[in-house]
């Protein structure tokens, strides 16, 4: 196999591996109280537009169950902005945290109207919740 062909397959594999290891590392770093806080914050700030249940419905925004590791803009039945559809790297815990800090700054042109979550601890808790749901 030529180096060009191998590299075409290596990059997506490496990106997927990094996303998966990021999720595993985050899940092991999150204590139960932090995940519980994240669930509360999700209910307070996110649940009006998003669900996070396996096979849950799409509301105004996409179902966030399994978001870490998923490619942005790919969940069926959701109308995404071109800006979101153009994102190619899978969501990581760090990417989710950056997005919920300031969605418009992270992905200019996103349809998400949320102003953002300023507190880093709260962002970490929400990310822990999303990473830990089964």
PLM features: residue spans?
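C-terminal segment of classical bacterial N-terminal signal peptides
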Residues: 10, 18-27
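Sec-exported extracytoplasmic/periplasmic mature domains
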Residues: 43, 47-54, 69, 101-105, ...
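Short cysteine/histidine-rich zinc-coordinating motifs and their immediately flanking basic loops
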Residues: 58-63
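Short Fe-S-cluster ligation motifs
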Residues: 74-97
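C-terminal capping alpha-helices of c-type cytochrome domains
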Residues: 90-134
């Amino acid at each position: 196999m030529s180096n060009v062909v191998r590299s075409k397959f290596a990059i997506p594999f490496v990106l997927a591996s990094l996303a998966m290891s990021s999720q595993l590392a985050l899940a092991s770093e999150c204590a139960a109280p932090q995940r519980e806080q994240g669930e509360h914050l999700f209910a307070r700030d996110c649940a009006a537009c998003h669900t996070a249940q396996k096979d849950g419905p799409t509301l105004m925004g996409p179902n966030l169950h399994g978001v870490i590791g998923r490619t942005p803009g790919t969940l069926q039945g959701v109308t995404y902005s071109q800006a979101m559809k153009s994102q190619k790297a899978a969501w990581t815990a760090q990417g989710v945290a950056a997005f919920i800090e300031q969605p418009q700054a992270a992905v200019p042109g996103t349809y998400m109207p949320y102003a953002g979550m300023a507190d880093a601890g709260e962002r970490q808790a929400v990310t822990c919740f999303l990473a830990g749901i089964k």
